[in-house]
Amino acid sequence: MKRPIDFEDAIREALADSVTAYCKPLPKDFELPCVLITQVGGRTDYTWAGVGEIDAADVTIDSRAETDAEAVETLRNAIGYLEEAVSSQTTPLLMMELNTFSSTINDPVRPDLKLCTARILTRARREEI
């Protein structure tokens, strides 16, 4: 059987050596600065000839830090490291595309922290189990 990969975990693993990254839910004792990876949508895309079944996922990456500058820097680094991992083909992810990058706001959960969000589109082959 083939099934979609766990996009959140694949992204977290790709970032593990460079950025403190969590999949939802964010733990109560999270480290700063960090990113939270959340899949917010997805679909199956059968159009890639020669590659097989491909899934696409819309994912948000939320960066949390003590300052605006640190939140932005952490998010920029996470995106850069993820692009590197995708292009080096060391993850199940085949591609990623940055769709939006927000300005910083106060974190609604922890107003003492700054939050910056990016939305990306990723694609990956289905995993066989």
Per-segment meaning from a language model:
Residues 82-129:
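Acidic-leaning, charged glycine-interspersed low-complexity segments
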